[in-house]
Amino acid sequence: MKCAPLLVLIGSIAVAAQDVPSVPPAGTARLPAALAPEKNLCASRADPVAIGSVQWNGWGRDLFNTRYQPEPAIRAMDVPKLGLKWAFGFQGGSDFGQPTLVDDRLFVTSSAGRIYALDAKSGCTYWTYDAPTGSRTAISIGELGQSKRAAIPRKLKRTLAHLDVIKAPSAAFFGDDTGAVYALDAQKGTLLWKSQVDTHPTARILGSPTLYNDRLYVAVGSNEDDNTGNPNYSCCTFRGSVAALDIASGRVLWKSYTVLEEPQPTHKNSAGVQEWGPAGAAIASSPTIDAKRGVLYVGTGRSTTGIEQSLTDSIAAFALSDGKLRWVKQLNVSGHATSSGFTSSPVLRTLTSGNEVILAGQHSGVVYGLDPDHGGEIQGWPGAADANSDGGVAWGSAADHRSWYVALSGSLALPGNSSGSLWALDPKTGVARWHTQSPTPACSWSEGPCSHAQSQAVTVMPGGVFSGSMDGHLRAYSTIDGKVLWDFDTAKTFQTQNGVRASGGPLDHGGATIVNGGVYIISGNALLAFSVDGK
């Protein structure tokens, strides 16, 4: 591994709240077609949402984005008995989100813009909300806070003492493909507020918003990277950012950019089209919260102009209070065909020694352990655990108390040459405890070349780690030795609870959600619910 890390300390790059409009014109993403009402409405109305301890709330289940479920209500020995319990079909095509499960309710976004609240046991529909454009984030559920009791004359206090204080509703927070963030009433599905965090035409919220202490932390990504090779596109002007929103109103409290300078005209390309810069450093993952140090961590993407900036291809720490940049560790990797950017969330983990480490994997296939107390200094890992020079860590890793589990996607640009693999690493040293190559069955939908890349986010529970593959198979591996415990091919057609024709396919982006004995996964336009023996 060739690596030239750079530590840069910079002052505040926060933007005042008044500089960010709350509700500007709608974004430019494709508007979904009108969807039919769901046919499987629950027989009874939903109760208010009670936020408990055993749940999967948001992207990583906890603030540290470990993607670890310590209380799955499934024993590792019963994982081979998992069977399909029910399926639900999304209207409007394939979906790439991840279910959130709180209080026996599943909350799910969709690429068609419909947001769902389903009963986790039966798959019936409590409510839907149709956003004007698609969403692919996980949903975070949180209480908006308790309203204050109005001033009451002393002589009436005893009379009214039995009355409960009226509480604000719990809310479901998510982002969409135009850079907007929403809050819905989690019980009823009605819109509470909408806030436009970024107005760039290519802005989108790819990383799930993270809720902490009455603030919603939102990272902003983009699809402008797709146009960098287009000579007719005036490239590039998008800058990545992270923002803090007030959960009660959606007001932007601060916003910090990952490219410090505003883009300016640079030159005209061979087609005579004006080009711009600097730009890039999009954030495609969910922020990780470090309450102890008062910061959040994000991983950034590459420069879209070919000129590296101080925060491109980096892990960066921003202050939770005001968005000031605390430190940044740039991790450019030379000699790799794939990007050195980060699209998966950093994982904050406590070692057996009591010290903490930031675990980060990038598209290059290189993984790192960084010291949160010393500006992201690289821990003494041999070769930085360069597990696979063919690439790459895509959407998310997982960590329990013993190991860090990293799935590698291989080169998606080479059909039939993407084997994929799952690695268990020592989070202290980066040494591999085991690794298992992805099995290579033929894909159900084709006899031709088939990718077995493992780009989907990983999920771990005691004794078992779940990793999906582009071949459509969801597999559970032993956390001890990496042996495959269970294998389910999702690339098939399913009978659904709501009567929508649903078919699975390649597994990508959002990973498995495990709560109360159930395993939930999205494949194609199907949401699949598994339990032991399908009961």
What are these regions (language model features)?
Residues 20-84:
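Blade/loop signatures of beta-propeller domains
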Residues 57, 63-69, 93-97, 116, ...:
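Short, solvent-exposed loop/turn elements at domain surfaces
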Residues 74-91, 115-136, 140-168, 174-203, ...:
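Extracytoplasmic/lumenal domain signature
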Residues 207-208:
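Extracytoplasmic mature domains of secreted/periplasmic and thylakoid-lumen proteins
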